[in-house]
């Protein structure tokens, strides 16, 4: 099972991940969000991260030219879409960049899961909403037809129980491994350990 730690904001966060060894490191690259980082900070984080930990750039309804600043310079190895991007946008994105694409879906009903199942993205992420720290109704996941990353409301304390009931392809956490708005090394290590042991 893959583990993504999202919302890195400092090179210190990358140093924590270098010892905790998750599978992916995520950065919010669209401006205007609490965890958004500049291109310069993103480059510094990428340079600090161990080469074998891919960096995921999270974008919200961004023009292709903006994504190119990160995709064409090696700052990111994966593109994650967290807005209202449609199938046409996704096809154009995949033609423009040769990076794998993760598409996030806010799950409030079975209809949202139906849309997610049809996505042409390389991976899909099922979430309660960007960075809310709250879970959606996991009972909706029964019989979901494709592999998915699970996000929203995950923490070191609850992840084992969640994974005892559901077997996602991977898990994605941000606020659940923070203390006072910053990444907490102990929580990150505890989360990774709990997932690896589940």
Ranges and model annotations:
Residues 1-126, 130-198:
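Conserved N-terminal beta1-alpha1 strand-loop-helix module at the mouth
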């Amino acid at each position: 099972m893959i583990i993504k730690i999202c919302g890195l904001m400092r090179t210190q966060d990358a140093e924590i991940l270098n010892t905790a060894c998750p599978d992916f490191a995520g950065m919010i690259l669209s401006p205007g969000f609490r965890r958004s980082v500049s291109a310069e900070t993103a480059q510094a984080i990428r340079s600090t991260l161990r080469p074998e930990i891919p960096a995921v750039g999270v974008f919200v309804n961004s023009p292709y030219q903006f994504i190119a600043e990160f995709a064409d310079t090696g700052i990111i190895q994966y593109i994650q879409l967290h807005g209202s991007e449609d199938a046409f946008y996704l096809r154009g994105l995949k033609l423009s960049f040769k990076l794998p694409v993760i598409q996030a879906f806010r799950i409030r009903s079975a209809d949202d899961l139906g849309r997610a199942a049809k996505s042409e993205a390389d991976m899909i992420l099922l979430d309660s909403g960007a960075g809310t720290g709250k879970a959606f109704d996991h009972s909706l996941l029964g019989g979901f037809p494709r592999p998915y990353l699970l996000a929203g409301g995950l923490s070191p304390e609850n992840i084992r129980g969640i994974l005892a009931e559901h077997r996602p392809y991977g898990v994605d956490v941000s606020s659940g491994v923070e203390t006072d708005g910053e990444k907490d090394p102990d929580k990150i290590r505890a989360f990774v350990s709990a997932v690896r042991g589940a």
